[in-house]
Amino acid sequence: MSRNLKGVLVVLAVVGLASEQRAHADTESKFAELRDKSDRFEGSFAAFLDRFVGECNDPLEASTCKQASAEFRKKVKGKKFYFIIGEDQVSNLSAGSYNPSRNEFTVNLTPFFPAGGYALTQGAPKKTDANGNPVFPFLPIKVKLPPDFSPQRFARTIGNKEVRMQLVFTPQDTWAIAKRGGGKLEGVRAQLEGVVLSLASSGDTLGAYYGR
């Protein structure tokens, strides 16, 4: 190989790496802006859903509970909120396809975020699957494979719950759908503003979804 050609290849490699770093920086800065403009809830994600839904099963406290939930919904509707979903709680990701020419992996995000018996969703569910779970279309997230990761290793990373999630959403209303065998499933209908995935082991950003 000629010295000139080697020089060209080195330049191309550096340009490619710089482009990838810029893409990650853009992803992080765009999400950081959303995050920094969001409200914080003093409590867990599960506690937020519980207060918003306000199922109020205790008959002795039902009236007070429902009033408190109604006031909470009025207070937070239309505001953006930020939460971190730990890797042990992330259950709505699945491995999609791999594009070898771009070294790009598609992670399928189901916009169903369960916690504490309820779930936050993008829109309200219309039906359930054979297992009684609400059905939603995937939201694809394009991920550049991290260094030293094969497609197989990355798929295992998804399956082994080694991915952390940051979430910004705007709560809109409650929803309920009949549950197989009786009863109902309930949750919070929301607009997903942004979702960022990162490796739990290093914190490195993998990719992001933006709703608007």
Indicate where each model-derived feature is located.
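Mature extracytoplasmic/lumenal regions of exported proteins
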Residues: I85-R212
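Sec/Tat signal peptide C-region and signal peptidase I cleavage site
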Residues: S19-A25
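Coiled-coil-like amphipathic alpha-helices with heptad-repeat character
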Residues: M1, G16-L17
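Bacterial N-terminal signal peptides
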Residues: L9-G16
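N-terminal Sec/ER secretory leader and immediately downstream segment
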Residues: T27-I85
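Bacterial N-terminal signal peptides that target proteins for export
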Residues: M1-L9
